[in-house]
């Protein structure tokens, strides 16, 4: 325990004059400046040993941000969560290195460079030169590092920037190269041709996880749907009608699929332009085509989809039509233009017949499975090639209109098909649907067949699921919920990008297909061995980026002619591959620090927002499983999303959130930290950020904490005639002799320490905040309120108790409000830093015995239970006063307290009278109260609007049961269960309100009183009748309050005596005279004059 004593008032300085209402931003700047000068962060890291084999290290992985954009509230939130746990673990004696990292590669960096260069196409990049473009990328990626460092510093987040890693550094890139080679050697990296989400602007594919990370990837888009009727080959005037939302894909329609068990109909319109023709449609979807079919259409027959399987139709467009196209080895080959069955067909929309083209993943899988050869008619900019000459050069979405026009009129390329075989545009409609957009540039994506390198996630999926069970997820439902389900449905990961600024894919291939060869490299030394040197830039420096690594070319060893050469494929790795490699690449593993990596893997703790279950969390897990057969992390917090004040996504345009720097300047960082860390967002929910919410944090947390410190210093400095009281830590042998209020506070402090410790051990940061908030109420609104007189009387036990508690409390508060805790703790103790102090252990973690502090912070369950009941009585009674609009300064005659263990509460009769301003209190057991007609009635109110969507018609039965009393409270969940004709039905939070009401049989007494049930049982009844004496005393106490305000305005010391002159309305003079002695005593008035006047006036002069 600390040897420090307080005060240092006689030493001068801040502790002698603690401000009652400080500027928290100014205080924080002072603390930050002190930390910088003292090098406190580095000292906190160095003070704890690593231990043998680094066993005493707590390993934290910091997810790397991009530094080519300014930080925002999301970074702020995550940064605070990243700081809390390492601070706590450091105080527990663990060594916690906090190395910062930077994501520097990938399209975000390229797009920023393009913006700065004023270019927007790949052609322009290639024209200026890849080397110059990559130089621009390098310059842009660390553009805002200073802003980031200032921002992180201001939020009091301790990180090591000096030793931070960057994904563009050669050691990091070499480790990434090694990882790719390992995956390749294990058969987990392969090249494939698949349909992938593809960005036309960036000219590169995306991975499936990139479409699921953020909600705004999918945006509403208006398109035109078409239902195209294709002519059946084996039936006159019969057409199969397929449906698509992408008209531009119709020129490459190669097949149709139906549901084998779905009901279809062959219908013949009897009127309109389609009269006499027959159309195959899904039976359930006929209502969608009433206009086209007319009123009196004929159902020729009904059939299952399986009966359509194998039937053939004529192609819509002529580009891949004719005998040659339908022959072996050509597109689409002999199986093209055939109807097949598939299990993914439904009748939710469309026709029940699904168009198959090589621009959908399911489509491509079907075409491949049926032996249909397909082709890609788009170039890498998603413009039609010469394979579709009528639309050559048209961008895919721009081609929709001419394709529709040709389908509508049967002209253009359709005119080349004989009319008796020609397809018909059966229906076209405008259609609004949720459509994926590129998360980097917001361009609508298409699904396009591309050649890409993949990680075979599906091969290791069972192991991914197994290892996930070893991870502690916060909140816990993410493990088998969002993350577990994502793993269960994981697809192979596309890792190659047709771009420029990134880690190169270390694959070299022969330029002559006659002599095929593939070489994959896993280190710079392997490259040097084969190519004679490392990749070097124009200055001769080793550089693994394009174009320098592309310059490594050698003769193909498998070519006896010596003419073919080995060239690197042009693709670079997905930047997520690098992010997923940070666990080992930051150490340059396996080339250096092999033992260090093995001792720091997996991480003990990581934290990011919930979307990273499809991003960084997921890819760390994939890479760790594939390479090391271990999880990458042990504990992970997935927090929710920060929303603007209107509940929408934060937007600079909408200005729907308070400026971060403005919040720091007005309220301080600790207030923002607390606002975020105490919210449901750390339990996975979302959070609306408002200035009011942050201001409330200052009022409810920051100021009360400071006020308790100010109160202590005010009285401690004033004691002994201004010489000060040397408050110190209590000793264990003193505790038993302390007053009950002191022992209660010590017991509650012990419970605070244990609750916060348990919560932070479990990474439940918001639960720790809840424990602190509850304790602040105990400390400020209970202990200090009820012990002021003892401090006035310079009671040593009160000083030492409050000092002991505040010192321990600041150590608990240190991770959660680090700067306020620092300022208060240093002011109390004169110590170097609370962040260099030990956590206030009350129980030794190794032995389970009480520590020295634990023998002072002694728990006393009986005392705590009794005092909590007393506080409950006070809270309930004050609520009654507020409801009755009777101020606390107004005395009342009687309070009735009914409780189970009433004797325990009765022992605090005087305390209750003083706290509640009550003249008399009657105490009664529940049994005695019932005998006198007093009881608690339990009522259930069902919120039909909230419960209706879930319960449907059952909600009416729930309401009826609530009124008839056919319900009970489930003992385990605490939720009400109502009886319905279908059985018992449990209501969920938000669907109901439980009300406990006091019922009095005596109507006369009930009319003159108000009552309230207490949360843990029992109730209070407050007599609200007022007589002349009570009103007079109430007025006198209002006068006392006005005098105290005048003392404060005159800047008088708490011990200063005064001469008092009161101006009082004539009708109130008698009230003042009646309570003259009370007023003089409470205000320290040595002389007291009363004058008549129009309104109350107060004059105070130091006596």
From Swiss-Prot:
Name of the protein this chain belongs to: Isoleucine--tRNA ligase
Reaction equation(s) it catalyzes: tRNA(Ile) + L-isoleucine + ATP = L-isoleucyl-tRNA(Ile) + AMP + diphosphate
The keyword ATP-binding appears for this protein: yes
Residues the entry annotates as binding ATP: 652
Family as reported in the entry's similarity comment: Belongs to the class-I aminoacyl-tRNA synthetase family. IleS type 2 subfamily.
SUPFAM superfamilies, sorted: Anticodon-binding domain of a subclass of class I aminoacyl-tRNA synthetases, Nucleotidylyl transferase, ValRS/IleRS/LeuRS editing domain
The entry's keywords: Aminoacyl-tRNA synthetase, ATP-binding, Cytoplasm, Ligase, Metal-binding, Nucleotide-binding, Protein biosynthesis, Zinc
Signal peptide: none
Subunit structure and binding partners: Monomer.
Record text about domains: IleRS has two distinct active sites: one for aminoacylation and one for editing. The misactivated valine is translocated from the active site to the editing site, which sterically excludes the correctly activated isoleucine. The single editing site contains two valyl binding pockets, one specific for each substrate (Val-AMP or Val-tRNA(Ile)).
Cellular component, GO annotation: cytoplasm
Cofactor: Zn(2+)
HAMAP family in alphabetical order: Ile_tRNA_synth_type2 (MF_02003)
Lineage, broadest ranks: Bacteria, Bacillati, Actinomycetota, Actinomycetes, Bifidobacteriales
Organism domain of life: Bacteria
GO molecular function, a single term: isoleucine-tRNA ligase activity
InterPro entries (UniProt xref): aa-tRNA-synth_I_CS, aa-tRNA-synth_Ia, Anticodon_Ile_ABEc, Ile-tRNA-ligase, Ile-tRNA-ligase_type2, M/V/L/I-tRNA-synth_anticd-bd, Rossmann-like_a/b/a_fold, tRNAsynth_Ia_anticodon-bd
Motif 'HIGH' region: where in chain: 65-75
A Pfam family recorded for this sequence: Anticodon_1
Key word Protein biosynthesis present: yes
Protein location: Cytoplasm
Chain ranges for the short sequence motif 'KMSKS' region as given in the UniProt record: 649-653
Record GO biological process: isoleucyl-tRNA aminoacylation
Gene3D superfamilies for this protein: HUPs, Isoleucyl-tRNA Synthetase, Domain 1, Valyl/Leucyl/Isoleucyl-tRNA synthetase, editing domain
């Amino acid at each position: 325990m600390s040897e420090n004593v307080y005060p240092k008032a006689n030493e001068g300085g801040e502790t002698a004059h603690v401000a009652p209402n400080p500027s928290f931003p100014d205080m924080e700047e002072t603390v930050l400046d002190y930390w910088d000068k003292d090098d406190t962060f580095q000292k906190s890291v160095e003070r704890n040993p690593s231990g043998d084999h680094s066993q005493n290290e707590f390993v934290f992985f910091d997810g790397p941000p991009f530094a080519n954009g300014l930080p925002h509230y999301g970074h702020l939130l995550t940064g605070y969560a990243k700081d809390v746990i390492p601070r706590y673990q450091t105080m527990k004696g663990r060594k916690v290195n906090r190395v910062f990292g930077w994501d520097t590669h990938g399209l975000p960096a390229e797009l920023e460079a393009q913006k700065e260069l004023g270019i927007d196409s790949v052609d322009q990049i290639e024209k200026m030169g890849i080397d110059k473009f990559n130089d621009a990328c390098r310059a842009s990626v660390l553009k805002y590092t200073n802003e980031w460092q200032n921002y992180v510093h201001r939020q009091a987040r301790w990180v090591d920037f000096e030793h931070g890693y960057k994904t563009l550094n050669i050691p990091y890139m070499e480790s990434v190269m090694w990882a790719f080679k390992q995956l390749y050697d294990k058969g987990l990296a392969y090249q494939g041709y698949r349909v992938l989400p593809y960005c036309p602007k960036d000219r590169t594919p995306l991975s499936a996880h990139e479409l699921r990370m953020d909600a705004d990837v999918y945006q509403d888009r208006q398109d035109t749907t078409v239902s195209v009727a294709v002519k059946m080959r084996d039936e006159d005037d019969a057409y199969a009608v397929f449906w698509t939302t992408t008209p531009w894909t119709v020129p490459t329609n190669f097949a149709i699929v139906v549901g084998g068990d779905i009901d279809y109909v062959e219908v013949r319109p009897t009127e309109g332009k389609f009269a006499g023709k027959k159309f195959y449609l899904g039976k359930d979807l006929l209502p969608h085509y009433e206009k086209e079919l007319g009123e009196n259409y004929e159902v020729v027959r009904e059939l299952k989809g399986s009966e359509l399987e194998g039937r053939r139709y004529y192609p819509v467009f002529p580009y891949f039509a004719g005998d040659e196209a339908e022959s072996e080895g050509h597109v689409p080959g002999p199986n093209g233009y055939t109807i097949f069955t598939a299990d993914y067909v439904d009748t939710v929309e469309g026709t029940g017949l699904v168009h198959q083209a090589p621009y959908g993943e399911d489509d491509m899988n079907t075409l491949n499975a049926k032996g249909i050869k397909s082709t890609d008619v788009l170039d890498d900019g998603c413009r039609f090639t010469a394979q579709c000459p009528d639309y050559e050069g048209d961008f895919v979405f721009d081609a929709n209109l001419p394709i529709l026009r040709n389908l509508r009129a049967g002209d253009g390329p359709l005119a080349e098909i004989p009319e008796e075989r020609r397809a018909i545009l059966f229906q076209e409609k405008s259609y609004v649907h949720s459509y994926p957009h590129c998360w980097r540039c917001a361009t609508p994506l298409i699904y396009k067949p591309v050649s890409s390198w993949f990680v075979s996630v599906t091969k290791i999926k069972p192991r991914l699921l197994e290892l996930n069970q070893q991870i502690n997820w916060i909140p816990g439902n993410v493990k088998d919920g969002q993350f577990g389900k994502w793993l269960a449905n994981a697809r192979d990961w596309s890792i190659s990008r047709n771009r420029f600024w990134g880690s190169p894919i270390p694959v070299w291939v022969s330029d002559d297909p006659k002599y095929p060869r593939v070489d994959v490299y896993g280190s710079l030394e392997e490259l040097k061995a084969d190519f004679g040197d490392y990749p070097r830039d124009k200055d001769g420096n080793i550089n693994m980026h394009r174009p320098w690594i592309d310059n490594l070319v050698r003769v193909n060893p498998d070519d006896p002619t010596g003419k073919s050469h080995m060239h690197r494929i042009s693709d670079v790795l997905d930047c997520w591959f690098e992010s997923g490699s940070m666990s080992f690449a930051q150490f340059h593993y396996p080339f250096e620090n092999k033992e260090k990596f093995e001792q720091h893997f997996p991480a003990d703790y990581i934290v990011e927002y919930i979307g990273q279950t499809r991003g960084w969390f997921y890819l760390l897990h994939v890479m760790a499983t594939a390479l090391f057969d271990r999880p990458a992390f042990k504990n992970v917090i997935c927090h929710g999303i920060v929303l603007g004040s209107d509940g929408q996504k934060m937007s600079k345009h909408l200005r729907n959130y308070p400026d971060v720097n403005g919040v720091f300047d007005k309220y301080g960082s600790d207030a923002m930290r607390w606002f975020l860390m105490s919210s449901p967002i750390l339990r996975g929910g979302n959070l609306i950020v408002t200035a009011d919410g942050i201001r409330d944090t200052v009022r409810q947390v920051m100021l009360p904490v400071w006020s308790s410190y100010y109160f202590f210093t005010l009285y401690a400095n004033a004691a002994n005639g201004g010489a000060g009281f040397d408050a110190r830590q209590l000793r264990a042998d003193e505790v038993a002799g302390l007053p009950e209020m002191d022992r209660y506070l010590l017991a509650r402090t012990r419970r605070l320490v244990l609750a916060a410790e348990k919560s932070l051990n479990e990474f439940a940061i918001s639960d720790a905040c809840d424990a602190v908030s509850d304790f602040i109420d105990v400390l400020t609104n209970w202990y200090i309120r009820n012990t002021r007189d003892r401090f006035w009387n310079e009671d040593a036990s009160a000083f030492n108790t409050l000092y002991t508690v505040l010192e321990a409390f600041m150590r608990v508060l240190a991770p959660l409000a680090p700067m306020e805790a620092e300022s208060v703790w240093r002011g109390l103790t004169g110590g170097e830093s609370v962040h260099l102090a030990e956590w206030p252990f009350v129980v030794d973690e190794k032995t389970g015995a009480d520590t020295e502090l634990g023998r002072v912070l002694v728990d006393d369950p009986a005392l705590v239970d009794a005092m909590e009941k007393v506080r409950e009585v006070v809270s309930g009674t004050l609520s009654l006063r507020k409801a009755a609009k009777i101020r606390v300064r107004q005395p009342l005659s009687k309070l009735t307290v009914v409780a189970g263990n009433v004797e325990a509460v009765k022992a605090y009769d005087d305390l209750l009278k003083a706290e509640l301003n009550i003249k008399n209190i009657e105490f009664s057991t529940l049994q005695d109260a019932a005998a006198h007609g007093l009881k608690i009635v339990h009522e259930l109110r069902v919120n039909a609007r909230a419960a209706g969507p879930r319960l449907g018609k059952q909600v009416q039965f729930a309401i009826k049961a609530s009124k008839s009393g056919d319900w009970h409270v489930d003992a385990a969940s605490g939720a009400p269960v109502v009886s319905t004709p279908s059985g018992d039905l449990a209501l969920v939070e938000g669907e109901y309100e439980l009300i406990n009401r006091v019922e009095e049989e005596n109507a006369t007494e009930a009319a003159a009183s108000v009552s309230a049930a207490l949360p843990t049982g029992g109730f209070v009844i407050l007599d609200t009748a007022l007589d002349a004496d009570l009103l007079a005393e109430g007025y006198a106490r209002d006068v006392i309050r006005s005098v105290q305000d005048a003392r404060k305005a005159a800047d008088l010391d708490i011990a200063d005596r005064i001469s008092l002159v009161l101006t009082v309305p004539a009708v109130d003079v008698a009230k003042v005279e009646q309570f003259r002695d009370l007023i003089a005593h409470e205000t320290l008035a040595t002389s007291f004059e009363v004058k008549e006047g129009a309104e109350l006036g107060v004059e105070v002069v130091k006596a």
